[in-house]
Structure formats: structure tokens, C-alpha cells
Amino acid sequence: MKQVIKAPLITEKNTYHNAAGVYVFEVDLKSSKTEVKAAVEKNFKVKVDSVRTSVCRGHSKQTKFGLTKVAYWKKAYVKLAEGEKIALFEGV
């Protein structure tokens, strides 16, 4: 069984989405929208209204050891039903 949700993405830009009931997570690259919806509903015990996903391209990064690759990754914008909140994001 794969772990669908890897980490919450808490950035200044994403905190503006929280006011509208949209929360952003880094998810497994091969997970689908229905898998993300089920994982959020199960882990945080909330009702999910919709899920939008975005695949972020990998790129090359210069380090002191030379050029390395940053892998592709996927993020999911999860919109909750009216009145629902995730406590993990509150107070950030």
C-alpha cells in the first residue's frame, strides 16, 4: 500500500488559499484525484468537495558536487466542504 499524502505544503502563498477552504499537499506522483480525496477524508476526518492536481517539473540544480537533478513531484489542491477545517494548518 502506497502512502498517498507525503507532506502538507505550508507556504505564504498557500496560507491565502486556507481562508477559502483550500489546502495544499505534496502527494505521490502516481496517485489519482480519487485516491487523494479518500486519503484526506480518512486521515483528517473531513468532507472533501474537490481535488485539483498539478505535476511540478524537475530541474537541474547546481551544488558544490556538480549538477544534480531534482525529481518531478505532484501537489494537490484540496477544497473542503463548507465549514470544514484541518487543524494542522490552523495557527500557521
Swiss-Prot record:
PANTHER family: 60S RIBOSOMAL PROTEIN L23A. Keywords: Ribonucleoprotein, Ribosomal protein, RNA-binding, rRNA-binding. GO terms for cellular component: ribonucleoprotein complex; ribosome. InterPro entries: Nucleotide-bd_a/b_plait_sf (IPR012677), Ribosomal_uL23-like (IPR013025), Ribosomal_uL23/eL15/eS24_sf (IPR012678), Ribosomal_uL23_CS (IPR001014). One of the early assembly proteins it binds 23S rRNA. One of the proteins that surrounds the polypeptide exit tunnel on the outside of the ribosome. Forms the main docking site for trigger factor binding to the ribosome. SUPFAM superfamilies: Ribosomal proteins S24e, L23 and L15e (SSF54189). GO terms for biological process: translation. Belongs to the universal ribosomal protein uL23 family. It holds the Pfam family Ribosomal_L23. Part of the 50S ribosomal subunit. Contacts protein L29, and trigger factor when it is bound to the ribosome. It comes from Bdellovibrio bacteriovorus (strain ATCC 15356 / DSM 50701 / NCIMB 9529 / HD100). The keyword Lipid biosynthesis does not apply. One of its GO terms (molecular function) is rRNA binding. PROSITE patterns: RIBOSOMAL_L23. This is Large ribosomal subunit protein uL23.
